[in-house]
Amino acid sequence: MKFVLLFGVLLVTLFSYSSAEMLDDFDQADEDELLSLIEKEEARAKECTPRFYDCSHDRHSCCRSELFKDVCTCFYPEGGDNEVCTCQQPKHLKYMEKAADKAKKFGGKIKKWFG
């Protein structure tokens, strides 16, 4: 039994040492890569399509609201043959955002009363 325990401790020690070395190598090698990805993400975020604007050129370019991303919704106007696409917020997400806002305000009041 002592041999199994000693072998287990040795195995855990070797595993933790090797994983720590791998993490150090990963952190040093990919730090610059991570910064470049963050810069690209910031640049991409500036190109979003505002709510109720045309999104037919890129249906995944709608901006985010407070909690959720808007959705590109396409429809045919009455009496027209051309498809129109605009960024819109689905009603269920709108209601969820309102409920979250009310919960935040109520939480602030509770904190004020008891804090």
Curated annotation (Swiss-Prot):
Residues 1-20 form the signal peptide. InterPro entries: Spider_toxin_CSTX_knottin, Spider_toxin_CSTX_Knottin_CS. It comes from the Eukaryota. Residues 21-44 form a propeptide. GO terms for cellular component: extracellular region. Disulfide bonds join 48-63, 55-72, 62-87, 74-85. It is found in: Secreted. Keywords: Disulfide bond, Knottin, Secreted, Signal, Toxin. Expressed by the venom gland. GO terms for molecular function: toxin activity. PROSITE patterns: SPIDER_CSTX. The presence of a 'disulfide through disulfide knot' structurally defines this protein as a knottin. Belongs to the neurotoxin 19 (CSTX) family. 01 subfamily. This is U3-lycotoxin-Ls1a. The lineage of its organism: Eukaryota, Metazoa, Ecdysozoa, Arthropoda, Chelicerata.
